[in-house]
A protein has these predicted regions:
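Acidic/His- and Gly-rich active-site-bordering loop/insert found
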Residues: 2-131, 147-154
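Acidic/histidine-rich catalytic neighborhood of metal-dependent amide-processing enzymes
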Residues: 123, 129-198
Length: 198
């Protein structure tokens, strides 16, 4: 019985035949935003605080995602960002978690690590996959939903630390702030694979 339940839980089901049409202009707009984020060097080092790097990045985010910064409550905890988007209900909040910092760029690169080059259908550079892509995706999704006048069913938090790459205190500070507010997330979306068990 356990195997049958696991199989049923893990087997994808076809939920829709909908296939979005390619939109090259939209894809390029997304690529350009991610490119700008990559060009903003947010390299972090263990126990070295360089707040000016993250202040520049935060200013960039405000320019790229104006509705997020106009409509959501923003809390900055030593460069770690927490945005709050109130929903119609508050019992099943979600947290969209990512990090702003990147590891030092070492070795040989096909494209310069902070070039943000858009080439061969990709955005190149440090943070393209770890994980300014997540920062961009979360902010862009909320930006577009705000533009459409969408109100979430439950509270949404965007949490983004600036010390993840060296296991610093950023994420713990964000968690402490959520706990202080009495937030018990129903769902946390973070980088990495899915977790299907407690």
């Amino acid at each position: 019985l356990g195997a049958a339940v696991a199989h049923a839980a893990l087997t994808p089901r076809k939920t829709s035949a909908y296939q979005p049409q390619p939109d090259p202009d939209r894809a390029m707009a997304y690529a350009e935003k991610l490119s700008a984020m990559i060009r903003c060097d947010t390299t972090s080092y263990a126990n070295v605080r360089e707040p000016e790097k993250f202040e520049r990045f935060h200013a960039l985010l405000a320019g790229l995602f104006p509705l997020v910064h106009e409509k959501l409550e923003r809390t900055d905890i030593d460069g770690n960002l927490l945005y709050y988007w109130p929903g119609r209900a508050h019992d099943r909040p979600i947290v969209l978690m990512s990090h702003q910092d990147v590891v030092p760029a070492e070795g040989t690169w096909e494209h310069a690590p902070f070039s943000g080059d858009i080439a061969d259908g990709k955005v190149w550079g440090r943070g393209a996959s770890d994980t300014k892509c997540s920062v961009m995706a979360f902010f862009q999704a909320v930006e577009e939903l705000l533009a459409a006048g969408y109100e979430p069913a439950n509270d949404v938090y965007i949490a983004s630390s600036c010390t993840e790459e060296w296991a610093g205190d950023g994420a713990p500070k964000l968690v402490a702030e959520l706990k202080r507010r009495g937030v018990r997330p129903f769902l946390v979306c973070d980088e990495g694979g899915g977790i299907i068990t407690e």
